[in-house]
Design a protein with these regions (language model features):
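A residue-level signal for conserved active-site and pocket-lining positions in enzyme catalytic cores
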Residues: 65, 115, 161, 168
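OB-fold (S1/OB) nucleic-acid-binding surfaces
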Residues: 118, 122-150
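Hydrophobic core residues within well-ordered beta-strands of beta-rich domains
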Residues: 111-113, 132, 164
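Short nucleic-acid-contacting surface segments enriched for D/E, G, S/T with interspersed K/R
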Residues: 151-167
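Sliding clamp-binding short linear motifs
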Residues: 1-105, 147, 175-189
Length: 189
């Protein structure tokens, strides 16, 4: 019941007694009522909960269904912009990147791709320097990782669940990486 509520599968059961999806979830799944009286008490007790935030909805849909809700993150303007680039063979989804395709690269030989960061992990090298290990997805729900070397965690911020266009280095052995996060990552929208 919990997963069905958080993934939106029970949205058609929400009526005017509930102030939102989070209120509905709390009243029926968080503290499951045994009788109709208990349901009425839960509805009253959790009334201030309202709705899930956009970030919570994205998180639940991605984690519970296994499909990232790109339509909640990429608006029509960004979608059109990406489509026009992709019509010319440029800026593919990160999971569609082909190292042999010349149009997928900029003048410096870097891979130009778009993606949506899902999680940013701060890690340390053997010498104690911080770097990001960024878990990303795209419209294909393809999961990839990007290593961002030489970062300053106070200055170099990556917003999760926001679309980015980036020029990245690519190695078949190591995958995607960058050494200049502030210069290579461009947030879209």
């Amino acid at each position: 019941l919990d997963v069905l509520c958080r993934s939106g599968a029970l949205d058609n059961l929400i009526d005017d007694r509930f102030t939102g999806r989070k209120h509905f979830w709390a009243a029926i799944a968080k503290e499951r009522p045994r009788k109709e009286k208990n349901l009425d008490e839960n509805i009253e007790m959790y009334a201030e909960m309202g709705d899930f935030t956009k970030e919570e909805v994205i998180h639940y849909l991605a984690d519970l269904t296994g499909v990232f809700p790109v339509s909640l993150v990429v608006n029509d303007q960004i979608r059109k912009r990406l489509a026009s680039l992709q019509e010319n063979g440029q800026a593919p989804d990160i999971s569609d990147y082909d190292p042999e395709e010349p149009l997928h690269h900029n003048g410096r030989g870097q891979a130009v791709v778009w993606f949506i960061p899902r999680k940013v992990n701060v890690k340390k090298t053997k010498k104690g320097k911080a770097y990001y290990d960024v878990e990303v997805t795209d419209s294909n729900s393809g999961a990839k990782r990007i290593k961002c070397w030489g970062i300053d965690p106070q200055r170099d911020l990556i917003h999760v669940n926001r679309p980015y266009l980036a020029a990245l280095d690519y190695s078949p052995d190591w995958g995607f990486s960058t050494r200049a996060l502030y210069a290579t990552f461009k947030i879209l929208g």
